[in-house]
Amino acid sequence: MRPALAVGLVFAGCCSNVIFLELLARKHPGCGNIVTFAQFLFIAVEGFLFEADLGRKPPAIPIRYYAIMVTMFFTVSVVNNYALNLNIAMPLHMIFRSGSLIANMILGIIILKKRYSIFKYTSIALVSVGIFICTFMSAKQVTSQSSLSENDGFQAFVWWLLGIGALTFALLMSARMGIFQETLYKRFGKHSKEALFYNHALPLPGFVFLASDIYDHAVLFNKSELYEIPVIGVTLPIMWFYLLMNIITQYVCIRGVFILTTECASLTVTLVVTLRKFVSLIFSILYFQNPFTLWHWLGTLFVFIGTLMYTEVWNNLGTTKSEPQKDSKKN
């Protein structure tokens, strides 16, 4: 029952989270900082109450290690959300972030001196080609959909390039953080709930540097049209409602992934998260009518197949199917 519940939470929470993020970004493209701050604050308060026991429970992993992890996590979160300000469409944002396998492999080879099979290199090549196709086609759309002025078109393209650079940086930084986490968990044991709390609580002072931008968007949110929440009948500006739902769904998504990691094998977790991204992408294209050509679909297919190849889903499904047959023969 718990694995089924976890899968339901991941799909319901993560997919709806993307929807509310796009609703926010479409109305105010520069709202990434206030969204990040709200998410961090909510998870930090929840963790302080239920995980840290109001600060009475000492951390299993020393704070100095969390400080390093938090610096990376804060940077990745802010840069990823800020990329939406730089002419990056939500579908491309999702596809590009699916390239985490590439970043993990590159840094794994460089830092951990890992070696992989030809099968895994092939899968990464597919993911790389898929992301390149989607990125290249999005670049053509940015220049063609810009203003008729040639200067405006060039300026939009430059901002788009900065967005791609930001996403690439965040991708590599996220992979480096994953390697750092892996070494910490090997040394101190797995404490994922504790890590979740400290990763969101310790960066909160850093938002002081973004306070002006957060305040400006809070004022803009206050000026949005009023919306009456069904059932409870409370009325509030619709942008605050979108933000509230984004926070709640983000929490549901994170909790779902956490339950999934404790109940299922890592292969299952990867497969569920990959399928969730694919569903979110399709919904974003169909519901929000984001421009998506045949080339984009081809690139997405390459990314999806490459990810499944990397996790060796087919091989593992074959072994799991053969195991019951062996058991039945023995009986």
UniProtKB/Swiss-Prot annotation:
Recorded superkingdom: Eukaryota
A GO biological-process term: UDP-xylose transmembrane transport
Intracellular or extracellular location(s): Endoplasmic reticulum membrane
Transmembrane segment boundaries: 4-24, 30-50, 59-79, 92-112, 117-137, 153-173, 201-221, 229-249, 251-267, 268-288, 291-311
UniProt cross-references to Pfam families, sorted A to Z: UAA
Keywords, ordered alphabetically: Endoplasmic reticulum, Membrane, Sugar transport, Transmembrane, Transmembrane helix, Transport
Single annotated GO MF: UDP-N-acetylglucosamine transmembrane transporter activity
Principal location class: endoplasmic reticulum
GO cellular component, one term: Golgi membrane
Family per record: Belongs to the nucleotide-sugar transporter family. SLC35B subfamily.
Job description of the protein: Antiporter that transports nucleotide sugars across the endoplasmic reticulum (ER) membrane in exchange for another nucleotide sugar. May couple UDP-alpha-D-glucuronate (UDP-GlcA) or UDP-alpha-D-xylose (UDP-Xyl) efflux to UDP-alpha-D-glucuronate (UDP-GlcA) influx into the ER lumen, which in turn stimulates glucuronidation and excretion of endobiotics and xenobiotics.
Name of the protein in its database record: Nucleotide sugar transporter SLC35B4
Species the sequence originates in: Homo sapiens
Gene transcribed to yield this protein: SLC35B4
